Amino acid sequence: MLHTIQAELFQLTRSKLFWIIEGLLFLLIFVSSFGEASFSLYVSTPSGQDEIVRQGWTGFQALNQVAHDFLPFVMIAVLVLTTSLLGRDLTKKLYKNTLASGLSRKEFYLFKTATLATTSLIQLATVFVTAFILGSIFHGAGRMPIDFFKSFSISFFRAYAFIMACSSAFACLLYLTYSTLASYLTFFVLIMLQASLHAIFPQLNSDFFTFLILAGSLWGGYQAFQHRDL
């Protein structure tokens, strides 16, 4: 399975779509890092007047920004990559050739899921590293917080769980519909419904909701593909 995943990733990196997505993400991070060059911070002085101090996002502050502000962009990028990795096989029914070579449906589903998980992890890590480097170039690395490793690990894990939940939900829709357009439309309708649900019930545990979507999507996609007629 490892060699199959490597082959899928290698094929993905040879596509123009992959580099277009990566270029757009880099441009967004670059513009945002450059655009956030300063923000107003009011500091009380002994004279009783507030003094405006100009500061910028440092490398460590950029990591926090990515964990909150850039996840929607990463999500869209991963959805496009999911379409490239899985959508083409399902919509054009190219998976039949793979199954005819002796691979079972379970094995096909597992290696596709593993490939999507690996792609999401690499994509997210790349965005964090790029943001840190650009933030450090523009404004310096800054002072590392005392609890940096703990807080960053939690933020990264939550971000990865969110990206994987979105990717799995979209993949589940692809397995159900075999239609890229229908999957995109349904996915964004579900996103809006989820946002409305959180607005109405803010006390809902978002982490639990994320893992519920992740588990349900993985199970639903597997069942849909297992019982789908060739």
Question: Where on the chain are the PLM-derived regions?
Answer:
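Aromatic- and glycine-rich beta-strand/loop motifs that create alpha-glucan
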Residues: 1-25
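Short coil/turn motifs that cap or connect alpha-helices
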Residues: 104-105
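Transmembrane helix boundary and interhelical loop/hinge segments in multi-pass membrane proteins
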Residues: 82-100, 113
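Hydrophobic alpha-helical elements at and bordering transmembrane segments
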Residues: 5-12, 108-109, 152-157, 225
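Structural signal for the C-terminal ends of transmembrane alpha-helices
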Residues: 33, 87, 195, 219-226
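Secretory targeting signals
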Residues: 22-85, 110-180, 187-188, 195-198, ...
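Junction motif at the cytosolic side of a transmembrane helix
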Residues: 5, 11-12, 212-230
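Alpha-helical transmembrane segments and their helix-entry boundary regions
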Residues: 18-21, 98, 108, 182-184
